[in-house]
Structures are given as structure tokens and as C-alpha cells.
Curated annotation (Swiss-Prot):
Residues involved in Zn(2+) binding: 130, 133, 150, 153
Name of the molecule in the record: Adenylate kinase
InterPro entries registered for this protein in UniProt: Adenyl_kin_sub (IPR006259), Adenylat/UMP-CMP_kin (IPR000850), Adenylat_kinase_CS (IPR033690), Adenylate_kinase_lid-dom (IPR007862), P-loop_NTPase (IPR027417)
S-S pairs: none
Subcellular location: Cytoplasm
Highest taxon in the source lineage: Bacteria
Pfam families attached to this UniProt entry: ADK, ADK_lid
Source organism per UniProt: Anaeromyxobacter sp. (strain Fw109-5)
Assembly, per entry: Monomer.
Length: 214
């Protein structure tokens, strides 16, 4: 089974990727994990990515594709894998198609987790984090015992700039602009399936499994 997961920030895509990986016994592969792995191993790709990020630049398709190629050459992907955060563009999607075809493999399904903008804004803008220990809370879903203060060390909680409503909306708009061509790409190939991303992680997993079985 080879799955690709799409979804805006706050849609719970990463959580579903982990649950699906455990359910089907295949690795969950995210671009963030790949970057961190190469950085930790001190590879040439890792050094290149770090230099680009330190300079405030964007990692090119070629570099990302090379990391994916390296990751998919490992034996743990023999039964399949779940990709989270890649591909992000139609060019990357075409590269992945060619890479898989050269190994006699193909994508099983592309799952797009859809969540209304208001729900995403509420979900993300409610996050509060502790600047001291890094603990993360949510004002309604997972509040601290004393509102505004960390349970562990009583430090004042803060809202990250990325989590402010106006910035969440901006990220949503950027995601939509980048992802619509990708969704059209996979829809034209009959691979795209939409999953409602509202509910408990377990409930969404159950819906996802029904979609995969259909």
C-alpha cells in the first residue's frame, strides 16, 4: 500500500499518517523527518538543506526529490509507505510517478483531509505553549489547570505568531493555492479521495479505512 496524504495546516494529517502507519504496518515518511535525518547523519544533502534554510531560502524540488529517492531505496518500504508533506507540486508528483514506475510500483490512493477554514483557525489559534519547557495546550480542547500558566513550571503561556488567526488564514490560502493543481493532477488519474477531517483521531481513522476499502 502506497498512500499520499494531503491536508491544510491543523487538519490532523500527521496524526492520521501515524495511525495509518501503525494500522497497516508501513513506515510514515514526512519531509520534515527526512530533513532531520539527513541533518543528523551529516550527509551532503543534509548540509545543503541546512545552508539553504540558514539563508532563509526554499529547498528546491531537486533536493527534496533526491531525499525522497534516498528514503524510498530503503528496505522498510517493501510493503508500502505513507507520504506526508510530499509531493507538494505537480512537478514533484510527476517525479514520484516516474520513480515508482521504475521500481514497478504505483500509488494506491491519495487522501485529502478537508477541514473548514473556521475549524482550522479555531483549532490552531487556540494553541498555547510554554516558553520554558515546550509543553503545548489548547484553550478549549486541552486547557492548563490554571488558565494562561503551564502545569509543569507555572510559566506564562504564549501564542506563537504562526498560530495567530490572521497568520493561520494566510497559511490556509497559501496551502490552497499550492495544492489545488496537485489535487487536480491526482483526481485526473482517479486516485484522489476526500476525507472529512472533523472528529476524533480514531473516528477519522475509521472513515479513512472505509474510504480505502471502497
Amino acid at each position: 500500500m502506497i498512500l499520499i496524504l494531503l491536508g491544510p495546516p491543523g487538519a490532523g494529517k500527521g496524526t492520521q499518517a501515524k495511525l495509518l502507519a501503525a494500522e497497516y504496518g508501513v513506515p510514515h515518511i514526512s519531509t520534515g523527518d527526512m530533513f532531520r535525518d539527513h541533518k543528523a547523519r551529516g550527509t551532503e544533502l543534509g548540509k545543503t538543506v541546512q545552508a539553504i534554510m540558514d539563508a532563509g531560502g526554499l529547498v528546491t524540488d531537486d533536493i527534496t526529490n533526491e531525499m525522497v529517492k534516498d528514503r524510498l531505496s530503503r528496505p522498510d518500504v517493501a510493503k508500502g509507505f505513507i507520504l506526508d508533506g510530499y509531493p507538494r507540486t505537480s512537478a514533484q508528483a510527476e517525479y514520484l510517478d516516474g520513480l515508482l514506475a521504475s521500481a514497478g510500483r504505483a500509488i494506491s490512493r491519495v487522501l485529502s483531509y478537508e477541514v473548514a477554514e473556521e475549524a482550522v483557525v479555531e483549532r490552531i489559534s487556540g494553541r498555547r505553549s510554554c516558553p520554558k519547557c515546550g509543553a503545548v495546550y489548547h484553550v478549549s480542547a486541552n486547557p492548563p489547570r490554571r488558565m494562561g500558566y503551564c502545569d509543569r513550571d507555572d510559566a506564562g503561556l504564549v501564542q506563537r505568531d504562526d498560530d495567530k488567526p490572521e497568520n493561520v488564514k494566510k497559511r490556509m490560502a497559501e496551502y490552497a493555492a499550492k495544492t489545488e493543481p496537485l489535487k487536480r493532477f491526482y483526481s485526473a488519474r482517479g486516485l484522489l479521495a476526500t476525507v472529512e477531517g472533523i472528529g476524533t483521531p480514531e473516528g477519522i481513522l475509521a472513515v479513512t479505512k472505509r474510504v480505502l476499502a471502497s
